[in-house]
Amino acid sequence: MQRGDVVELRLPKGVGHEQRGHRYGVVVQSDALLPRSVVLIAPTSTSAKDSTFRPEVDILGERTKVLVEQVAALDIGRLGDHVARLHGEAMWSVDDALSTVLGLN
């Protein structure tokens, strides 16, 4: 597993606006901290509203938003198959959005 990998998520029933159901997630944890039993993941959504801090990327031919404001530490048991990897501009847009939501700009 590497930073930028897109994996299937097995999420529990969420509360309120927490993500749930079948979706993908982007590994945003540093490669220096992998592998671990818990990994930082940004979930994705094809139906989330547009926002300046939600980068839109292509995953398996479908445009999807990376919900960087909902990054979570997930046990690796909640991670399914590796389906893709974000490279170049797509990963840069995730990094830039993470900087914005974490106040690192």
Outline where the language-model segments fall.
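Conserved functional hotspots at enzyme active or ligand-binding sites that engage polyanionic ligands
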Residues: 1-105
